[in-house]
Design a protein with these regions (language model features):
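C-terminal "closing" transmembrane helix and its immediate cytosolic amphipathic cap
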Residues: 2-3, 280-297, 308-375
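Functionally critical transmembrane alpha-helices in membrane proteins and complexes, commonly lining
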Residues: 13-73, 91-99
Length: 375
């Protein structure tokens, strides 16, 4: 049965689960990175490495979720003008404002070289160096701009043979890319200089393709009951593999973890599978969590943009002191407060902006009405 437009906009889907879990997990990555800046955190580097590896799936999951939800909610396909205008307001405007907030209010969180000239300032806005997490925006917006390509793939991959070819060709190409990255970049001095490779959309194309194919075969996938079992096995192996790689370098540096490494790719796919299996189970039961997941997914991107801003304030106010004394409780409290306030502030800002728009619109309508009456 085809979904109505209202149903497509209101029902939680697998994409919502992927986006909500990715946003929730990614906030922990920055918290753990800050924890390692303390002596107490370095003393607990092994559990921190395990925790970090367990939540290192967020960017692939978010891309997969975006593509799944977009494929589901863009039937019939909207005009490019309509789609890009909608994405500009939903993604572009929040990205612009939060990037400016980081550069102007918290310039200390800039990555690599801080901006000292106008040209460098503009470059920091574009390349994702304005804050530790904004590299993802640079990559994700490329995926969004390429949506016409993904629509063409959806229209083309309508048979089993074509979907099989799409998955196999993507897998082989990406495997060769991983080998080249590991051999020519990761294990060399180029790794630090070539950090912009993480911001190129090509490295995340497989997850976009996965989201498209997952949408196309969803009626069959939603019948699977044991998807979580192999995902748990492969995910456990991949986490251990990542931790082994991280702990080879002392002191522990989480920057050494790259989404382009085989262990990280295996874990990202396993984590996506686990989240999909949870979504299947809850969708089948019509869980009461569906509206909650949909709400979280709606505000996930904007909360993600804001999280480092609030975490920096929390860390400066009392987080560092608490984590230096009780690293576990300190990092947990910083994470919970960051998560709660990121979503709360995002929602309050949304309500405020909606109220302001209503006031402005009413004022304009009243002025137009008065002008028409006077004429």
């Amino acid at each position: 049965m085809r979904e109505t437009k209202v149903q497509r906009e209101q029902l939680a889907d697998v994409g919502d689960y992927l986006k909500a879990f990715a946003c929730t997990a990614v906030m922990g990555q920055t918290v753990l990175s800050l924890g390692l800046t303390t002596a107490a955190g370095q003393a607990q580097r092994v559990p921190i490495a395990w925790l970090y590896a367990a939540i290192k799936f967020t960017a692939p999951a978010f891309i997969c979720g975006i593509l799944f939800s977009t494929m589901r909610t863009t039937i019939p396909r909207p005009s490019l003008t309509q789609y890009y205008r909608q994405q500009w307001h939903a993604l572009g405007v929040p990205t612009l404002w939060w990037t400016l907030a980081y550069l102007l209010i918290l310039p200390s969180v800039q990555q690599h070289q801080p901006a000292r000239t106008v040209e460098q300032f503009l470059w920091q806005m574009v390349n994702g160096n304005a804050a530790p997490h904004l590299w993802y925006n640079t990559m994700m917006l490329q995926i969004i701009l390429l949506m016409p390509v993904w629509w063409v793939l959806r229209q083309w991959a309508t048979t089993i043979g074509r979907r099989k070819f799409l998955l196999e060709s993507t897998t082989i190409t990406y495997a060769l890319g991983m080998w080249a990255y590991t051999y020519w970049i990761y294990d060399t001095a180029r790794y630090g200089r070539w950090y912009l490779t993480d911001r190129i959309f090509l490295g995340f194309v497989p997850y976009a393709v996965l989201g498209i194919v997952l949408y196309l075969v969803w009626p069959r996938v939603r019948q699977w009951r044991w998807l979580a079992v192999p995902c748990l096995v492969f995910g456990g192996v991949a986490v251990g593999w990542q931790v082994h790689q991280l702990l080879q370098v002392q002191p522990l540096s989480l920057v050494r973890s790259s989404y382009y490494l085989p262990a990280n790719v295996l874990y990202a796919l396993s984590a996506i599978g686990l989240i999909v299996s949870l979504a299947i189970w809850q969708l089948r039961r019509q869980s009461r969590w569906l509206p909650v997941i949909h709400w979280l997914a709606t505000y996930a991107y904007r909360a993600y943009l804001a999280n480092v801003f609030w975490l920096t304030l929390i860390w400066s106010a009392f987080g560092r002191q608490l984590a230096s004394r009780h690293v576990g409780w300190g990092l947990l409290l910083c994470y919970v407060l960051t998560w709660v306030w990121s979503f709360t502030a995002t929602y309050l800002l949304h309500l405020t902006w909606q109220k302001l728009k209503t006031i402005i619109l009413n004022w304009r309508n009243r002025k137009c009405h008065e002008r028409n009456q006077s004429s």
